[in-house]
Amino acid sequence: MKHINDYFWAKKTEENSRLLWLPLTQHLEDTKNIAGLLWEHWLSEGQKVLIENSINVKSNIENQGKRLAQFLGAVHDIGKATPAFQTQKGYANSVDLDIQLLEKLERAGFSGISSLQLASPKKSHHSIAGQYLLSHYGVDEDIATIIGGHHGRPVDDLDGLNSQKSYPSNYYQDEKKDSLVYQKWKSNQEAFLNWALTETGFNSVSQLPKIKQPAQVILSGLLIMSDWIASNEHFFPLLSLDETDVKNKSQRIETGFKKWKKSNLWQPETFVDLVTLYQERFGFSPRNFQLILSQTIEKTTNPGIVILEAPMGIGKTEAALAVSEQLSSKKGCSGLFFGLPTQATSNGIFKRIEQWTENIKGNNSDHFSIQLVHGKAALNTDFIELLKGNTINMDDSENGSIFVNEWFSGRKTSALDDFVVGTVDQFLMVALKQKHLALRHLGFSKKVIVIDEVHAYDAYMSQYLLEAIRWMGAYGVPVIILSATLPAQQREKLIKSYMAGMGVKWRDIENIDQIKIDAYPLITYNDGPDIHQVKMFEKQEQKNIYIHRLPEEQLFDIVKEGLDNGGVVGIIVNTVRKSQELARNFSDIFGDDMVDLLHSNFIATERIRKEKDLLQEIGKKAIRPPKKIIIGTQVLEQSLDIDFDVLISDLAPMDLLIQRIGRLHRHKIKRPQKHEVARFYVLGTFEEFDFDEGTRLVYGDYLLARTQYFLPDKIRLPDDISPLVQKVYNSDLTITFPKPELHKKYLDAKIEHDDKIKNKETKAKSYRIANPVLKKSRVRTNSLIGWLKNLHPNDSEEKAYAQVRDIEDTVEVIALKKISDGYGLFIENKDISQNITDPIIAKKVAQNTLRLPMSLSKAYNIDQTINELERYNNSHLSQWQNSSWLKGSLGIIFDKNNEFILNGFKLLYDEKYGVTIERLDKNESV
């Protein structure tokens, strides 16, 4: 290929008047080499086995998986060997560089290229051109489509590919096949293909293997990753224009890869003694439940999905981490994803996962990289500390072994890191049609997946969850589901999706009618095509919770009674507005110091501080206040390890009520005598189903009615958890109300509930990827053509989160306060406006985000809200565009009264109560 190095370019730029370029062959060689090194040093054993087993061998060539990965790297930019690409003007260079590179081509015999004016060069993007050329030269669709999609999106259909025939000049400069220049382009393109084949051990196109679709996705992701690394000029520098070749090619690849590679591949130990495993990892011996689980998994041959249903506080997290090591060893995984419902729960577990990661390293000199992935990860102090240490000397193990690799910190690459903690959205997006989706599949297919706090997922989110699990089944990736309150039909759907991904037909599975049992605790798992359940455990200590239905007008009396002679009273309600109203009322009566409030409408830094304060007050081993009222929304039920002496809650679906009950008498501590019996009060139960409007909007009448119907006067934990959840969510269990009008109201609510589910499922399917193709059929081809058709229109991470959760659009701003003639943070009385371009100050400011109330982001007014904010920022905060931390953000400055007028509303921020909103024309709260 030496002769081709002289004239085709892959990259070009200009730095300090130096004209730089990278010959196409050098970039292809770099990418091929990176693909080979990633195969050897980054891919998990399980991924390699998947690819090798997906190959339909056409020859006796060894290591066909690795060779195919390298071939893709070697040929991926063949579409750049076309006039359409070579005549492109550079984005970061003078015209002089463009001219000189075209002159190289002229001297090489491509006469007229300097003056060529193509009619439609953009119709033949080099990725599509690459697929078209490979197909033209005999490469099968399954491999050629990977090349066509290496910029993040495969072609939607063959029509788009076939249309390339209409642009012969884009490929050959001339439309006449017998012209010299046409033949010269053709012979050079063939030379690139033949070089790629020879370099990777294939004698001809006919020797290239056929490969199944799931493995195509992994190879596609691997190619994109290889290309991105090889395109990084810090790793692989460009050459001066007068250079045509790299002097020391082996040194170039070795140096470049070492600059990128900072962590070692995790190779899990094989433990025979499970007690030792727990002691070394967590510092304690396993409980009966944990030991039985690990012993069960140890006996399996080909495990896949494991569902753990057990009460709160039994140690499911440690059980999952121990089992993830066992599954990694059995299935050849080399990483972990731990997903939780919210940013707060992800933050809460990050330190524990980091410590486990440190412990699995043991006394080795291994270095492991870990990521915290959600919208507010930069606020997590533990993650920030790791970020500060990410420039450690990797040869010096004294400097720490768990760190953050910056290359994996981008939103497209974070899923590729070995150990990732984040919100469950990250996993749900495996099923969302998004550009560069193959990268996310590449990252998740090398890990054990743990999804914590899986309850009765919304029907919309379930579409993405079940599809993502189906793809994990196709990849043979272990999935661990943790839940305290899982409806039986949800358990069945999870298992069914995974088995379908494996290619196992549901009707062929024995004893499937047993899957919906209500035993508790319960382990459900597969071993190859068989499903098993474990329900025999050591009898657990029972805790009695007494349930009282509480009329709203008696709330004050119960709270006062709970405080008399000492006690911590918790109140969990379903809306922010109600929590604020209650907090104000009780503060007026009992004093500000007696009442704490937590919900999602605080400035982000304030919410995190409030969560920490709460854990210090009523968390494990906390020094508890003699008396306290703590009011909050659903954030209090989500993994905060807190303990109330008495708990009051709005009515909610049964599984969520039980989650809330999990915060009542959670720890074994000495309590005031009158609180020795656990009492749980439920607000908002109505015989006529006249539920609170805010609660109805959140949960719907149907589940509220069924929960109210089956809610007993006493719950025995943990024995009653599963039976109660199954009763509410088992729609086959019919209930009848004596009053005909009430029964009709219930049936109407059921119809509305069922319609809502159907609509949500239909809506979710719009941007959800299709099932993996395990076998070619007349309906579905064995390739990636059309895989991302109807791509989600917005590529931002925030929009993707909203899409997989079906969240209404919200507007987030950075909240500041007017100080003197400038502005500052609410927590500091200091004007920082003149130093806003200081990176330290800008980063601190960027952390103070606030989600505006929904009244400002309705379909009819969200555009106006954003337009007003943009005008305000252009006028008052234009300096932010000069800061990498603040560029693109929207800020608001509350006045001296903590007020801000926006789109016909007055916002008021209070450090105790959060943000509230009033409509200006009616002067009433919204």
Swiss-Prot record:
All copies of domain Helicase C-terminal, residue ranges: 551-745
Cofactor annotation: Mn(2+); Mg(2+); Ca(2+)
Domain HD Cas3-type: start-end pairs: 17-229
Effect upon mutating D452A: Loss of ssDNA-dependent ATPase, loss of helicase activity
One Pfam family named in its UniProt record: Cas3_HD
UniProt-listed GO biological process terms: defense response to virus
Gene Ontology terms, MF aspect: ATP binding; DNA nuclease activity; metal ion binding; RNA binding; RNA helicase activity
Coiled-coil segments: none
Regulation (activators, inhibitors): Nuclease activity is inhibited by EDTA.
Full protein name: CRISPR-associated nuclease/helicase Cas3
Organism encoding this protein: Streptococcus thermophilus
